[in-house]
Amino acid sequence: MARRPVLARHRIDFRNRVNYIGRFAPSPSGPLHAGSLVAALASWLDARAHHGLWRLRIEDVDTPRTVPGAAGVIMDQLRALHLHWDGEIMWQSRRGAAYQQAFDALAARGLIYGCGCTRREIADSALRGTADVDGERPYPGTCREGLPASRQARAWRVRVPPGVETFVDRWLGPQQQDVAAAVGDFALRRADGLWAYQLAVVVDDADQGVTDVVRGADLLGSTARQRVLGRLLGLAPPRVMHVPLIVDPATGLKLSKQNGAPALDCSQPLRMLQQAWSGLGFAPLAAATPEAFLQAAAAQWAQRFGMRHAAVPASPKAD
């Protein structure tokens, strides 16, 4: 008898589920910039090319990094760019109960343990010669068999099973990662009570019924561990596509809020959309309005990545 999925609480009516649900999930640590627009445009086009839904999720789970008012600015930018989302917005800061339920389900199976290690201790561990993944050292498993005497938990980690995780990225092709070796047991909750991004995104994608994740290539390193975590929770993984990053030609660094990327000038939406389209490797489109551009771009995207020669419907506007 097949094991029942742990998270059998989704509020989606799967009898009426569309074949494609995508999402854009910005963090409200500042306004959108040219790099984030590339990811937003790619995910929007992929949803429209598949006649699917495009959800908006505000990833404000890391509350200390949240900038007051930034979420509203992001929504205004998307509207100005004519990238209208479908349905209600999901806010991670309001979903603690959902994350707790997933955490408790894993803990009940002995898959969670407390860890008292500091970042410095992990960096100075026996694995210090191992390559970083997403800027972090792999966790060496110091507390896997129990906290050392006089130590208190600074984080709670999930026990990663052995094995190589393989998947096909729709842009980059076949990928694989030995999560246990490259990442180790990763944190799901911090000592201050904040939930980790990896747990939040897996639970949120499941609750929103997401079938396809289209995002920047800087998040490719998170995919394997998210698939592992989803499988431990009894969830089917979404398809993934990681699109190119936009690099500052002066510094060679990717455009990001941390690197001081300027906010989008949404007073010129067509120019911003054309630049993002170029960043995805497409030739310029002859279009006089943002609506005409998006219609033509979605048709080209469908030819390359979606249902060939399908009519592309106009996007419904968000409320």
UniProtKB/Swiss-Prot annotation:
Q: Where does Zn(2+) bind?
A: C115, C117, Y139, C143
What Gene Ontology terms describe what this protein does at the molecular function level?
A: ATP binding; glutamate-tRNA ligase activity; zinc ion binding
* Note accompanying the cofactor annotation: Binds 1 zinc ion per subunit.
Q: Which UniProt keywords apply?
A: Aminoacyl-tRNA synthetase, ATP-binding, Ligase, Metal-binding, Nucleotide-binding, Zinc
Q: Where does L-glutamate bind?
A: R23, F24, A25, P26, S27, E59, Y197, R215
Give the EC number: 6.1.1.-
Motif 'HIGH' region per UniProt: ranges? 26-36
UniProt xrefs under InterPro entries: Glu-Q_tRNA(Asp)_Synthase, Glu/Gln-tRNA-synth, Glu/Gln-tRNA-synth_Ib_cat-dom, GluQ/Sye, Rossmann-like_a/b/a_fold
List the ranges annotated as motif 'KMSKS' region. 254-258
Name the GO terms of the biological process aspect: glutamyl-tRNA aminoacylation; tRNA modification
Q: Could you tell me which Pfam families the record lists for this protein? A: tRNA-synt_1c
The cofactor(s) it depends on are: Zn(2+)
**tRNA processing keyword on record:** no
Query: What function does the entry list?
Result: Catalyzes the tRNA-independent activation of glutamate in presence of ATP and the subsequent transfer of glutamate onto a tRNA(Asp). Glutamate is transferred on the 2-amino-5-(4,5-dihydroxy-2-cyclopenten-1-yl) moiety of the queuosine in the wobble position of the QUC anticodon.
Entry similarity comment:
Belongs to the class-I aminoacyl-tRNA synthetase family. GluQ subfamily.
Q: What NCBIfam families would the database entry show?
A: PRK05710.1-2, PRK05710.1-3, queuosine_YadB
Give the protein name, as stated in the record: Glutamyl-Q tRNA(Asp) synthetase
Taxonomic source organism: Bordetella parapertussis (strain 12822 / ATCC BAA-587 / NCTC 13253)
Q: What is the lineage of its organism?
A: Bacteria, Pseudomonadati, Pseudomonadota, Betaproteobacteria, Burkholderiales
